[in-house]
Design a protein with these regions (language model features):
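Conserved phosphate-binding loops in N-terminal lobes of ATP-dependent enzymes
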Residues: 1-19
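General beta-strand structural signal in soluble alpha/beta enzymes
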Residues: 12-18, 68-70, 80, 88-89, ...
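Glycine-rich phosphate-binding loops at beta-strand->alpha-helix junctions
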Residues: 183-203
């Protein structure tokens, strides 16, 4: 898409903080199986925009801050920004469950479910990506509807919602050991960050690590524009990627 627009208008096109941007430190990519590696794929655009905003508002350069950013939306991810890079990333496939995603699950139970005969590959992917989390427990992906259930006295809804919030807090804390706990701030962004119930409960659990700052919502088009502007102004350098021989076939 970027190339076609570039050719039509005769101008350069930049792809900024795509989902597949991966800046994880080598130590954070390792797992218990050499054939499987952790990836820094997820809400990079929105989380870096939040980190850049915090740097700007605190009068510091992005490369000089250390922040943990939690993106709270249909999927929930948490990452660590340090030395101007996203050095650790907990994706929505391994972290807390969310309105739609199942999040991290007990491995042996997942293996059993895969071989139960109830799901093929596509069915299993749909289950964990679109039918998990709040949808699986409460039949809705709308956090506002869940909060209305809680206000109406639904104890089960409160248990599920509070479990999601607790797991968000746990995953925020998991990023801190990367920098020996020396974190400047914890940033909460995404659509669910509009919820005072959610943000106040998270703050109560993680403010012992660092101050919590809330930047609700997503402003991805503006973030893309500002990213391109920083390159044009020379504040950032565009990276050139070449297709490897293996990618050609």
């Amino acid at each position: 898409i970027a190339r076609s627009i570039s050719l039509q208008l005769g101008i350069p096109a930049y792809i900024y903080d795509g989902v597949t941007v991966d800046e994880l430190l080598p130590i954070n990519k390792l797992t218990g199986l050499p054939s499987m590696r952790r990836k820094g794929m997820g809400h990079n655009l929105n989380t870096r925009a939040a980190a850049l905003r915090y740097a700007r508002e605190s009068g510091r350069d992005y490369k000089d801050i250390t922040v943990i950013v939690a993106h709270l939306g249909g999927g929930i991810s948490v990452n660590l920004h340090h030395n101007g890079k996203i050095e650790d990333f907990i994706s929505d496939e391994e972290g807390p469950f969310s309105p739609e995603r199942a999040g991290g699950l007990p491995m042996f139970d997942v293996i059993k479910e895969c071989f139960s005969g109830r799901y093929d590959y596509k069915g299993m992917m749909k289950l964990v990506k679109n039918q998990g989390g709040l949808m699986a427990h409460l039949g809705t992906t709308d956090s506002r509807a869940v909060e209305q259930m809680i206000q109406s006295g639904d104890a089960h809804a409160k248990l599920v919602y509070d479990a999601m919030i607790l797991n968000i807090a746990k995953n925020i804390a998991k990023c801190a050991p990367n920098v020996c706990g020396k974190v400047d701030a914890i940033l909460l962004t995404g659509g669910i960050a509009y919820s005072q119930y959610v943000t106040s409960e998270i703050e109560k659990r993680v403010s012992c690590l660092a101050p919590v700052v809330v930047y609700p919502g997503e402003d991805e088009m503006r973030s893309l524009a500002l990213g391109g502007l920083r390159v044009l102004r020379g504040q950032e350098t565009a990276k050139i990627f070449h297709k490897s021989e293996s990618a050609n076939g």
